């Protein structure tokens, strides 16, 4: 499955230089149709520096990664984006050991995250992809 159709590694690296770039992208997709507080349902909010949204009424803060496969990562969001990119554009199968070495994370963490990505890819096969493909993974 080609999640990044027409997307070269160079274009990808230019787009996602920092974890904040990744958070900004996730926020733009997550709240594309507007924000609604998950606790009280209010629609007015403040945007924080990390692109999180804080409800004006109850003060609940929601991160762009909450409720996505990137929630509670034990490594940087940029690394996670790169792993997703590699998994979706590589023709050969990647092992957790390879990913662990390449991205300097533990084998167990690599295995767990790769499982989450594979599940998201399976469940999104019938959904339309956006230009980078993450929308269907979120």
Q: Where are these predicted regions, by residue range?
A:
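Residue-level recognition of single "structural anchor" positions
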Residues: 1-138
């Amino acid at each position: 499955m080609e999640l990044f159709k027409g997307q070269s590694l160079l274009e990808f690296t230019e787009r996602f230089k920092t974890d904040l770039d990744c958070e900004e992208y996730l926020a733009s997709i997550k709240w594309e149709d507007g924000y609604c507080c998950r606790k009280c349902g209010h629609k007015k909010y403040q945007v924080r520096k990390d692109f999180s949204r804080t409800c004006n009424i109850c003060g609940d803060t929601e991160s762009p990664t909450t409720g996505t496969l990137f929630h509670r990562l034990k490594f940087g969001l940029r690394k996670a984006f790169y792993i997703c990119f590699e998994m979706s554009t590589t023709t050969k199968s990647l092992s957790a050991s390879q990913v662990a070495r390449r991205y300097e994370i533990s084998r167990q963490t690599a295995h767990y995250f790769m499982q989450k990505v594979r599940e998201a890819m399976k469940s999104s096969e019938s959904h339309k992809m956006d230009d980078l493909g993450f929308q269907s993974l979120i």
